Amino acid sequence: MSEASGNLNSLRMANVALREELNALRGENANLGLQLGRALAEVNSLRGNVSSYIRWPVPIVPVLAEENLEFALSEIEVIPGGELPFLCRPPPRAEPDCISDDLLINVIQDRSTPDGPADPPLLPIPPPPALPPPASKEPPPQPPLAPLERPEIEPFSGDPVYLAEFLMQLETFIADHEVHFPGGAERVAFLISFFTGEAKDWAISVTQEGSPLHANFPRFLDEIRKEFCGPIPPRVAKKAIRKLKQGHCTLGSYADAFQFLAQFLSWDDCRLQNQFLKGLSEFFRKELLWSTEMADLDELILECVEIERKVRVPKPIPLPGVRNIIFPFAPSPNEEESEDEEYYSEDEDQEARRHRLHSKDQRKRMRAFQQEMKEKEEEEMKKEEEMKKKEEKEEEEEEEMKQKEEEEEIRNKNEEEGESKDEEDEDEDGGQKPEGEPQQDPGTEETYGEVEEEPLDEAQDDDLDELMEMEPTFVHASSQTSGPTSGYHAENFLGASPPIIQPSRRRNQNRVPLLEGLPGTNSPFYSSPQLIRRTGRLGQRQVRRRPPVLFRLTPRQGGHRAARGRIRV
């Protein structure tokens, strides 16, 4: 019994061991199946590579150099037909037949077994990759540029009033088309093509071959401003600087034109800044709202240059298909193209269709609202421009009125001064009346309205020329009696002729005051000169002229003044 139970236990143990071996074999079988699948996949890939390399490549023959040979290459006989020599021919190779699948599987199994060969099967060598052709030293030909349209700019003939606006327009055009003007010579030639007359002759003579201005565009602009610098009348410069607007021109050209015209004006810095801001474009004016107050015009121009530099920095390009976050209903280009095309699917339920139509209506409303806002902004801009134009016209009218008032005030002051001088003359006459008024010659009589009235100074000079023909009267101050020889004593002449009075002297210089305290001043022979009356402004004008009267003092009366000769009073 004990032997039977021992055998049974041993059989059971053997059965368990066999089952374990069976399970191990099943696992190995599964692993082999996986390896077989991978091997078949590699076989398929290798089959594709083999089929692509069926045509064997021609072997590379080494290049023979003449210095490495004992004889010249020219002594070699030329082989007809372009065939290679026998030594240079590649060994004959048979065309490979199609490899069977069983052979490939056996090769892979031998490779996977540890006793099999370790070397992989020989495969055809792929040809070396074709080297790219060497890059040529010459630059690639550039596509031809489109012909440049000539701008509609009035030619410059040399008038300095139009120089600022002319240069501003041309500098902006050249800056916008820099591709067509790569060098300074092209820019100088293009600028000269808009000159006419004397300006063109001067520019051609200055920019000849070998001249430093031939290819130096900035220096040529400076020479133009020096040559045609003016002068410009202040009134003309004021009108030109008010008409100067930046528009689409660059800031640098606008600033140069403004400073060129400002040098002919006597405005203060605050007024220049206000006028500079009026001519700026709307973009710069909006940006300057956030900046502080500028000290002078130069600081304002530098601030505008800094704003322009920030704007010219390239901005990142938005990714396509990304919806605007700020305005989620803003139109996208893809939606605008397919706006009219609507597709309805049968599977789309009613709620989804309703949501899609609602979003589409919202987009349309947003577009209409944005369009209305743009139209309102344009209308406001037009109104602001009209208001600015009206204000400028009113300012010009006010300035003209002020100038007229100032001129009228100056005229009134001159008239009042003339009247006051006439009254002073009458007072200085001491109330003495002339013995008789001379009759006016009909030839010299002038009527108001028939002949144009001469200026006051010219009329006075003419009257003085007429009076120069009258003989001067000499008085002896030491005698109080009148006589035919009282004015002709030797001590009064001293062998000298009377002085000649220039006609350009004013009447105030020839005025004779009352000689009080001197003997003989109230004598019967002394009388006031005659009055000369003429027609003038407002029908009558009274002009008083006196002949020059010279007095001589004796040494007893004159003292130290008698040594000087005649004393003119």
UniProtKB/Swiss-Prot annotation:
It comes from the Eukaryota. RTL5 is one of at least 11 genes called Mar or Mart related to long terminal repeat retrotransposons. They do not correspond to functional retrotransposons, but rather to neofunctionalized retrotransposons genes. Residues 476-485 have a biased composition (Polar residues). Residues 334-350, 416-429, 443-469 have a biased composition (Acidic residues). The gene is RTL5. Residues 353-367 have a biased composition (Basic residues). Residues 115-151, 323-506 are annotated as: Disordered. This is Retrotransposon Gag-like protein 5. Residues 372-392, 401-415 have a biased composition (Basic and acidic residues). It holds the Pfam family DUF4939. It comes from Homo sapiens. Residues 117-146 have a biased composition (Pro residues). InterPro entries: DUF4939, RTL1-rel. The lineage of its organism: Eukaryota, Metazoa, Chordata, Craniata, Vertebrata.
